[in-house]
Regions:
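Aromatic-anchored segments of alpha-helical transmembrane domains
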Residues: 45-56, 100-112
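Cytoplasmic-side transmembrane-helix entry/capping segments in multi-pass membrane proteins
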Residues: 36-41, 69, 93-101, 122-126
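Membrane-interface helix caps and helix-loop-helix hairpins in membrane proteins
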Residues: 57-65, 87-90, 111-123
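Alpha-helical transmembrane segments in multipass membrane proteins, preferentially the mid-helix core
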Residues: 20-25, 81, 131-149
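Hydrophobic transmembrane alpha-helical segments in integral membrane proteins
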Residues: 1-19
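Membrane-interface helix-boundary motifs at transmembrane edges
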Residues: 26-39, 86-92, 142-153
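Structural signature of hydrophobic alpha-helical transmembrane segments
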Residues: 9-15, 62-74, 94-97
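Central hydrophobic cores of alpha-helical transmembrane segments
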Residues: 44, 95-104, 151-155
């Protein structure tokens, strides 16, 4: 396995792919049909669920449970955006927006893994955190959700 080097070509390339996905996937689907929007939402939901399942398996079965505890804010943001995509309730978008973007963005740039690409933990980290921000971007671009200053107190 390769040690994680933040300025390595592979890490910068993966970060570029993550950021491009976050920006361009919702823009590409913006003017599509409602059925296509729904399919994209279910794709994001699937990414989040598979990532959380892999995380549970890796930390709960292969490693020790205590390595997965306490739950990180990104775990709550994952489930928040997942619930938003299923129900379209604004409160879940607000939580994912204010607590998900900063944490997930930092984790994409500086992952909490000892190894870089192609380690499974690294790939899982990048996909999971990209899915959080992709879900928030979906809500903003396709569902026209917007955070307002008054929403800070609600988060």
């Amino acid at each position: 396995m390769n040690e994680l080097i933040l300025l390595s070509f592979s890490h910068i390339f993966i970060v570029f792919i993550c950021i491009a996905s976050i920006i361009f996937i919702p823009k590409f689907f913006k003017h599509s049909s409602a059925a296509t929007h729904s399919s994209l939402a279910y794709f994001i939901i699937s990414l989040i669920l598979i990532n959380q399942g892999m995380d549970l398996y890796r930390e709960g079965y292969l490693d020790e449970w205590k390595l997965g505890l306490p739950l990180h804010l990104c775990d709550f943001s994952s489930f928040s955006i997942l619930i938003y995509l299923l129900t379209k309730k604004r409160d879940f978008f607000i939580f994912a927006f204010f607590f998900g973007i900063a944490g997930a963005g930092m984790s994409i740039l500086t992952p909490d893994t000892g190894y870089g690409f192609p380690a499974v933990a690294y790939i899982q980290n990048q996909i999971g955190h990209t899915a959080i921000i992709l879900g928030v971007t979906y809500a903003m671009v396709i569902d026209n959700q917007r955070p307002y200053l008054k929403d800070v107190a609600r988060a």
